[in-house]
Amino acid sequence: MPSNQELFERAQKTIPGGVNSPVRAFRSVGGTPRFIERAQGAYFWDAEGKRYIDYIGSWGPMIVGHVHPEVLEAVQRVLSKGFSFGAPTEAEIEIAEEICKLVPSMEQVRMVSSGTEATMSALRLARGFTDRSRIVKFEGCYHGHADSLLVKAGSGLLTFGNPTSAGVPVDIAKHTTVLEYNNVAALEEAFSAFGNEIASVIVEPVAGNMNLVRATPEFLGALRRLCSEYGSVLIFDEVMCGFRVALGGAQQLYGIRPDLTCLGKVIGGGMPAAAFGGRRDIMAHLAPLGGVYQAGTLSGNPIAVAAGLKTLQLIQAPGFYDALSRRTTRLVQDLTEAAREAKIPFTADSVGGMFGLYFSESVPASFAEISRCDVPRFNAFFHKMLDAGVYFAPSAYEAGFVSSAHDDATVEATIEAARGAFKSLA
């Protein structure tokens, strides 16, 4: 049986950095990444046979736990019929109907294979619909790795955005304006300065890639008002928070209706699937009806659709979200109490089945506030918990996830491990 370290060394010979997505490499926290052998319910096991309570859930999709028997059965039924057809299926219609029913702002929906495809396509559609080029995003929000979204703010409001990745041309980045999350005044100033140039504003209504940060109702309300006033397309990126924070997503929680919505993670049930959709008049601009091109060989893949459709059916069970939210709330409250007992500056927050852990005196409301958290102490806490068999996100800038498979005993085991970890850090 090879060790995690042996597998990591072997992986680095043929895979850049040894991983297929950077956060998996443990660069933020240090140490050796765990190579996963199998998973079940709220747990997974690494290559060395060690079991962990999993609070990543494949970064959100596993809301009903790993290898849920009904999801597994749905996938197995489809496998014998074919893996991929490159032609439409009835199942694609069924999942589209289910999504439109659960998220009323999505009058029509187009399936894709990843969150990046969803946001990239939604932005192209918004530009085609408005015949404008400028987009607005917010510091700390992650919308995938399309060139126009790997951009940070310039030195002032009216300056061009700057690329955050090598390989992103400045000529592309200059069309993206980056503002502070939850800053209504900056938003109003930007629209006043160049509102008639803005094709779209894209936002995570509950951010999860600068850790968990909630948008304020005032901020989202201002977004809706200004986009309507200036004819800009408001895009909610709910790839992470969609079906995670409520059955109808963050837009249900806040009572805000965006023009377009991007979904992913949960709608694939652990398989590669995502979607974007919204107002019928905007979606009519997509090929083959309109002039905005978008396509994908594996879009609406029957195996992914089967897993996603069954997951969407399971989360509609009576009391599902009440139980999920209650368990997540208990987790963050008990973690906060354990830190308080050890006199460690620490706070936590949760929305539905998402949560954030902050080594800080208060819950952050922006990327600047997140950046002031004690990252070295988080890293030490992460490794203490990992040693105790609890797997949190290997970065101080990522949210965590609870599933319906996390029962009271699982949460209690987590808290018991945390008490020891906090005491050792005091």
Curated annotation (Swiss-Prot):
GO terms, molecular function: glutamate-1-semialdehyde 2,1-aminomutase activity; pyridoxal phosphate binding; transaminase activity
Keywords: Cytoplasm, Isomerase, Porphyrin biosynthesis, Pyridoxal phosphate
Subcellular location: Cytoplasm
Transmembrane parts of this sequence: none
Residues bearing PTM N6-(pyridoxal phosphate)lysine: 265
Cofactor names: pyridoxal 5'-phosphate
InterPro entries: 4pyrrol_synth_GluAld_NH2Trfase, Aminotrans_3, Aminotrans_3_PPA_site, PyrdxlP-dep_Trfase, PyrdxlP-dep_Trfase_major, PyrdxlP-dep_Trfase_small
EC number: 5.4.3.8
GO BP: protoporphyrinogen IX biosynthetic process
Catalytic activity: (S)-4-amino-5-oxopentanoate = 5-aminolevulinate
Lineage top rank: taxon: Bacteria
Alphabetized CDD domains for the sequence: OAT_like
Cellular component terms per the entry's GO annotation: cytoplasm
Associated pathway: Porphyrin-containing compound metabolism; protoporphyrin-IX biosynthesis; 5-aminolevulinate from L-glutamyl-tRNA(Glu): step 2/2
Pfam families with a match to the protein in the record: Aminotran_3
NCBIfam families linked: hemL (TIGR00713), PRK00062.1 (NF000818)
Cross-referenced HAMAP family: HemL_aminotrans_3 (MF_00375)
Assembly information from the UniProt record: Homodimer.
Family per similarity comment: Belongs to the class-III pyridoxal-phosphate-dependent aminotransferase family. HemL subfamily.
Name of the featured protein: Glutamate-1-semialdehyde 2,1-aminomutase
Organism for this UniProt entry: Paraburkholderia phymatum (strain DSM 17167 / CIP 108236 / LMG 21445 / STM815) (Burkholderia phymatum)
Taxonomic lineage: Bacteria, Pseudomonadati, Pseudomonadota, Betaproteobacteria, Burkholderiales
